[in-house]
């Protein structure tokens, strides 16, 4: 089978060559902060799991080119014509510039599959609606230099190219330059820093009884069961009405940004403070961002033995009531200060990370769909024809996202979607992660 071709396009110095080196087997391009380092289009072989492709790096495009610029434009145009997919790159630090808008119009006229890649987003990043105005329906946020967000880019590439072959993922090193990023989040003084100190067996992070000691997200690299883990301690998330100081507003923004880039988020709850609506708000935000989540109840050693059973019963009831979208989410009860059940938390993170990356073949999905819809059929329409879901396929992982084709998608109720999602969790062992369904209409309404 002929290899698919992916071309990197963008104005100078947005990080095309850095991403080229990340995706290729060997470093081929020279990387420098000066614009215009790449003068010719460069080719290399790339590979994602079992999916191999040809990757092209192009010269940076600039408006009003001189003679050299015209020749570079010719190089880039040829690379676009050869491409099955274009990664149009912009600089997340500088935002959308006039050249980006002009060049996006130039690229889109070729009607190629495109992904907008917002690069250099290793620090706090405020997503600007201007990015949508560039006209691309698929947007991925990354840092090519630091290896952040690359798997999201890989999944977008697989989705755009409709590659349905199995992508084998090694949990210790899913792709070059990536690691398992675990963010520890929660309300202030839940014991987040103490928990990370317990894992690394070192007083690396400042702790104390005062709420709000951690003011910024702090990263700690760790190795666990041959897995490279980046532990990220965050500032506690308060209700908006209680955030007054400008520094704490910045800290909260930093925490929200860390969650966006996380693979797994540990939501830490103080057993003595009990579960509050703010905890559910944080959990909902994590799920809406599509992250996998573990709920950890800390300070379990301070709860009276006679009260623990009733506490757990009420806690599970609250979780199932307020967070039905992550049915079966792992819940662990620990004492960070006594290092009780710490390894169980890390084991749960490894397990749910694997589920979050799960890829189900189209054949298995449609056998399951046929069986499930026969057990509980969709309703009849007023015209007498039954609403049907004819076919489905997985369009991405992280979180698992599925496209379902129906003769009348508008008639599929939320309750029926919940039925399908919950049945899928049981059938494919996908408990505790967000699962997303999107419905599209069949071209033929009578099937």
UniProtKB/Swiss-Prot annotation:
Residues 358-443 form the KH-like domain. CDD domains: EngA1 (cd01894), EngA2 (cd01895). InterPro entries: G_ENGA, GTP-bd, GTPase_Der, KH_dom-like, KH_dom-like_a/b, P-loop_NTPase, Small_GTP-bd. It holds the Pfam family MMR_HSR1. GTP 2 binds at residues 186-193, 233-237, 298-301. One of its GO terms (biological process) is ribosome biogenesis. One of its GO terms (molecular function) is GTP binding. Residues 4-165, 180-357 form the EngA-type G domain. Keywords: GTP-binding, Nucleotide-binding, Repeat, Ribosome biogenesis. GTP 1 binds at residues 10-17, 57-61, 119-122. Coiled coil: none annotated. The keyword Manganese does not apply. The keyword Repeat applies. Belongs to the TRAFAC class TrmE-Era-EngA-EngB-Septin-like GTPase superfamily. EngA (Der) GTPase family. Associates with the 50S ribosomal subunit. NCBIfam families: GTPase_EngA, small_GTP. GTPase that plays an essential role in the late steps of ribosome biogenesis. This is GTPase Der. The lineage of its organism: Bacteria, Pseudomonadati, Pseudomonadota, Alphaproteobacteria, Rickettsiales. The gene is der.
């Amino acid at each position: 089978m002929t290899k698919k071709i992916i071309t990197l396009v963008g104005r100078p110095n947005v990080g095309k060559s850095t991403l080229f080196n990340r995706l290729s087997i060997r470093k081929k391009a020279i990387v420098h902060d000066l614009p215009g380092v790449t003068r010719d289009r460069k080719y290399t072989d790339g590979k994602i799991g079992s999916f191999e492709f040809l990757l092209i790096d192009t010269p940076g495009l600039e408006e009003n080119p001189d003679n050299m610029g015209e020749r570079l434009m010719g190089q880039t145009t040829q690379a676009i014509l050869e491409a099955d997919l274009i990664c149009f790159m912009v600089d997340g630090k500088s935002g959308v510039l006039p050249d980006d808008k002009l060049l996006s119009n130039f690229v889109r006229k070729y009607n190629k599959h495109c992904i907008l890649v917002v690069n250099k987003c290793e620090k706090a990043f405020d997503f600007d609606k201007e990015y949508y105005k560039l006209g691309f329906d698929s947007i991925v946020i990354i840092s090519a230099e630091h290896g952040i967000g690359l798997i999201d880019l890989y999944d977008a590439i697989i989705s755009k190219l409709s590659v349905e072959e199995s992508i084998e993922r090694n949990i210790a090193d899913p792709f070059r330059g990536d690691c398992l990023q675990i963010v520890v989040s929660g309300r202030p003084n839940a014991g987040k820093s103490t928990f990370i100190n317990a894992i690394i067996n070192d007083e690396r992070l400042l702790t104390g009884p005062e709420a709000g000691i951690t003011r910024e997200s702090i990263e700690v690299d760790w190795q666990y069961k041959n897995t490279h883990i980046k532990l990220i301690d965050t500032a506690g998330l308060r209700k908006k009405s209680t955030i007054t100081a400008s520094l704490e507003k910045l800290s909260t923004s930093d925490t929200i940004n860390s969650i966006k880039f996380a693979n797994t988020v540990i939501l830490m709850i103080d057993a003595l403070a009990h579960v509050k609506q703010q905890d559910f708000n944080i959990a909902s935000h994590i799920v809406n961002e599509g992250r996998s989540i573990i709920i950890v109840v800390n300070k379990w050693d301070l709860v009276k033995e006679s009260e623990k059973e009733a506490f757990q019963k009420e806690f599970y009831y609250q979780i199932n009531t307020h967070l039905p979208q992550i049915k079966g989410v792992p819940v662990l009860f620990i004492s960070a200060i006594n290092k009780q059940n710490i390894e169980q938390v890390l084991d749960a993170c490894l397990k749910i990370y694997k589920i979050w990356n799960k890829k189900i073949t189209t054949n298995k999905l449609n056998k399951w769909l046929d069986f499930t819809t026969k057990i509980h059929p969709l309703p009849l329409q007023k015209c007498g024809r039954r609403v049907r879901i004819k076919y489905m396929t997985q369009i991405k992982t992280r979180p698992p996202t599925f496209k379902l084709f129906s003769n009348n998608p508008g008639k599929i109720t939320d309750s029926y979607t919940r039925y399908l999602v919950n049945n899928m969790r049981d059938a494919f062992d996908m408990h505790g992660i967000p699962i997303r369904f999107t419905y599209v209409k069949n071209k033929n309404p009578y099937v």
